[in-house]
């Protein structure tokens, strides 16, 4: 069958299916309760409470989505636009928006490498959800496998594929422009998760059934190109994450992007730049009416020639500040341009930039538009203003940290969960000042209600001797005073005892010393033997242990220096 015929038949089948869906939709409308259509209240008997484990509140409109493209729900349009994505994409090239996106993308990219491979400790890590649990060798192997999977965005390494840094940069742009992040998860024939690829969020929509209601189970998402559904996905096959969710019943699960919220300000910024640009591109003349009063000698032909010369020579950049020459009785110019000086122009632009930056949670100074305070950036020198470093850190805490948390939740929900429920993805490191602030908080806690050993226990360290105390000078001083009072009390008791001894003349009975335990060896010298010498029949006279030892301390049965004769004592006399 020729390709053109196959394509034509495919279009015809699609049209038939759309027609059938529309007929089912109309039939459903006819079957809607007349109480709803006529806006009549329900009777109390027909109202059921959510006591059976089911939600009774409506999460979708009672009348389903009526769209020219049945099968999916589009985003609510603004300014009568049929496709909100196209409107957002049109203003997605705004210079302020791209400055914000590029700044945040570059900041996020600093966290897209494993922290254990970074010298600064900045990056991401895969760890156990249970902080107190010790990872086994199997857990460590799985953690390394997940890190490798994230780095390559697949089980295998392919230089033509996006790495995790590129994936996160695409994610930041998608969420800042459309507040919708989509990527497809690919599985092999055995159901194993092998890779994930980013998908254009402007082509992904929520699927609807024949009644125009959102599908809760099964193929909940569709991809639409040229107003035709080209692919369908279930919850496991496609990730659908939003950063600014809404409970609006007309919106469904679509997010609320900052670009849509500040669309009026973005349009005003574009118009302001165009207005200022035309001042240079269309010459330096202002808008107004040139009134030429011709004399009797002037003809209409000469006036037409002057008009053509004006338009040709004074228009464009090369015609700026040119002086026209005309011969007439009188020439007047009526200025129709409102007076707007450079200061007003600057304040208006500063206001737009500050409002847009505030909506994205970023300090204008991060995109090289320093703000001296106030909506127009004209105030400064306030005592409440911090230095530039503190303002930068506050800006990142307000905008960058929530963005990193959104990426963490997305990766954990749609990627890491495929490897088990016991693992968790999180970013680590960051600005050193933030870490110093955490240490200061711990230090203050250690001075009020936490002991040193409690802090060490939270950090996974062993307790130390003397660490069961808070690091508070007042508390330590109180402990020292208590010890000092104990010492004084002991000194007083000793003084009282000494005075009693003096008054009694030394007759106060002293506590008898402890008698040593009976010796089990007869050769041991007892305390009494040492003190009294045991004069008499005892073999241990003078405390000797062995009778074979002489008074000089030498053995009697052995030759020694005292038993050997010296000098002439050993020579026999003849």
Curated annotation (Swiss-Prot):
Q: Where in the cell is it found?
A: Virion
Q: Which spans does this entry mark as compositional bias, Polar residues? A: 522-535
- Show the ranges annotated as biased composition (Basic and acidic residues): 543-559
Alphabetized UniProt keyword annotations: Capsid protein, DNA-binding, Viral capsid assembly, Viral contractile tail ejection system, Viral genome ejection through host cell envelope, Viral genome packaging, Viral penetration into host cytoplasm, Viral release from host cell, Virion, Virus entry into host cell
Q: Where is this region: Disordered?
A: 504-574
Q: Output the Gene Ontology terms for molecular function.
A: DNA binding
Question: Mainly resides where?
Answer: virion
Q: Name one GO biological process term.
A: symbiont genome ejection through host cell envelope, contractile tail mechanism
Say which domain of life the source belongs to: Viruses
> What quaternary structure, including any partners, is listed in this protein's UniProt entry?
Homododecamer.
Q: Family, per the entry? A: Belongs to the phage portal family.
* Physiological role: Forms the portal vertex of the capsid. This portal plays critical roles in head assembly, genome packaging, neck/tail attachment, and genome ejection. The portal protein multimerizes as a single ring-shaped homododecamer arranged around a central channel. Binds to the terminase subunits to form the packaging machine.
The entry's protein name is Probable portal protein
Q: Which source organism?
A: Enterococcus phage phiEF24C
């Amino acid at each position: 069958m020729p390709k053109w015929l196959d394509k034509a038949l495919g279009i015809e089948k699609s049209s038939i299916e759309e027609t059938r869906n529309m007929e089912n939709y109309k039939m459903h409308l006819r079957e809607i309760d007349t109480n709803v259509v006529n806006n009549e209240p329900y009777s109390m008997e027909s109202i059921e409470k959510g006591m059976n484990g089911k939600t009774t509140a409506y999460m979708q409109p009672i009348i389903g989505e009526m769209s020219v493209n049945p099968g999916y729900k589009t985003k609510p349009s603004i300014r009568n636009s049929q496709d909100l994505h196209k409107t957002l994409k049109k203003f997605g090239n705004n210079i302020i928006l791209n400055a914000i996106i590029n700044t945040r993308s570059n900041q996020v990219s600093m966290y897209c490498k494993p922290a254990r491979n970074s010298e600064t400790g900045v990056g991401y890590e895969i760890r156990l959800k249970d902080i107190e649990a010790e990872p086994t060798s199997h857990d460590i192997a799985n953690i390394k496998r997940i890190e490798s999977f994230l780095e390559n965005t697949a089980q295998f390494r392919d230089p033509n594929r996006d790495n995790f840094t590129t994936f996160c940069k695409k994610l930041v742009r998608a969420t800042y422009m459309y507040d919708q992040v989509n990527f497809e998860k690919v599985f092999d024939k055995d159901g194993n998760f092998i890779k994930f690829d980013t998908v254009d969020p402007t082509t992904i929509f929520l699927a609807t059934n024949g009644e125009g209601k959102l599908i809760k189970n099964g193929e909940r998402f569709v991809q639409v190109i040229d107003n035709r559904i080209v692919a369908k996905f279930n919850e496991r096959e496609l990730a659908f994450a939003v950063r600014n969710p809404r409970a609006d019943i007309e919106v469904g699960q679509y997010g609320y992007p900052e670009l849509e919220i500040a669309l009026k300000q973005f349009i005003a910024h574009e118009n302001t730049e165009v207005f200022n640009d035309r001042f240079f591109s269309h010459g330096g003349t202002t808008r107004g009416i040139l009134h030429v009063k011709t004399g009797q000698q002037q003809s209409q032909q000469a006036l037409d020639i002057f008009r053509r010369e004006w338009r040709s020579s004074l228009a464009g950049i090369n015609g700026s500040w040119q002086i026209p020459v005309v011969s007439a009785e009188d020439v007047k110019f009526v200025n129709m341009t409102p007076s707007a000086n450079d200061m007003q122009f600057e304040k208006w632009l500063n206001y737009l930039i500050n409002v847009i930056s505030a909506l994205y949670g970023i300090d204008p100074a991060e995109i090289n538009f320093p703000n001296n305070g106030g909506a127009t950036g004209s105030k400064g020198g306030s005592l409440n203003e911090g230095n530039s470093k503190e303002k930068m850190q506050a800006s990142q805490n307000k905008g960058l940290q929530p963005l990193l948390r959104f990426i963490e939740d997305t990766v954990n929900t749609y990627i890491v969960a495929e490897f088990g429920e016991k693992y968790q993805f999180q970013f680590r490191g960051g600005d050193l000042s933030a870490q110093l602030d955490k240490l200061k908080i711990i230090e203050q806690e250690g001075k009020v209600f936490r002991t040193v050993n409690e802090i060490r226990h939270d950090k996974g360290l062993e307790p130390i001797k003397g660490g069961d105390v808070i690091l508070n000078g007042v508390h330590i001083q109180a402990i020292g005073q208590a010890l000092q009072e104990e010492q004084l009390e002991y000194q007083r008791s000793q003084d009282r005892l000494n005075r009693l001894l003096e008054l009694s003349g030394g007759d106060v009975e002293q506590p008898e010393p402890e008698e040593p335990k009976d010796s089990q060896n007869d050769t041991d010298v007892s305390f009494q033997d040492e003190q009294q010498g045991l004069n008499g029949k005892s073999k241990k006279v003078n405390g000797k242990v062995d009778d074979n030892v002489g008074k000089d301390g030498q053995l009697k049965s052995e030759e020694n220096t005292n038993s050997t004769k010296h000098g002439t004592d050993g020579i026999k006399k003849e």
